[in-house]
Amino acid sequence: IGGGFNAIEHKEAIKSFIETHTNTAIIFATARYAREYLDVNAPHFYCLVGNEGHRLTHNINPQNLSGICVLPPYPRPMGTEVPEYAKNVTFELENITFIDQYKDSVTTIALQLAILLTDQDIYLVGYDGYPGNVLSEKEMALTNENRTIFATYTTISGKILKSLTPSIYKEIEVVSV
C-alpha cells in the first residue's frame, strides 16, 4: 500500500479483495494509511525507512500494532527511526535481490518483502502517480524512482505488477478491484 489517495478512496473494495483472497499479506510502503487497515484480518508489514517510524507512531498506537516492521539491509543511507514500542517486532532484510538502485526506497523494500513472501501475483494499492504536466522536483524524482523499480521488477521476474486502484504508471497493469 503506497501513499496515494486511492488507497483511501477504494479502501472498502480493497478490504473486500483481501478478505476473499486468503493468504494475502498487507505491506505498507508508507504508514500514512496504516490506521485505515487495522481491522483487516491479514498479516501486516510496515516498511521503515527514513521518517516512516515517526509516521507509524503518528498513525498506530502501541497497543494496536499487530504487525512486523521491516528495515532495509545495512547500511541505511537514509537512516531509520524505529519506534520504541516496535523494536521487538522489527527485522532487517538480508539483501535486495531484484534491483541495484534505490535500495533504501520504501517501494523497493516493500517489493523485496513481497518477493520473499510469495511467488504469486503482487498487487499494488495507492500508487496513483502524480497527474498533471507540472511536477515538483520531489514528485518527478519519486515518479522516476517508482517507474525504474516497477520496470526492473518486471524485467527480473517476468511478471507485471498489478494495481487494484487507478494509477498513471504505465509500468504496472491496472485491474479492477
Regions found by a protein language model. Give the residues of each.
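Metal-ion/cofactor- or nucleotide/acyl-coenzyme-handling active-site neighborhoods
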Residues: 1-177
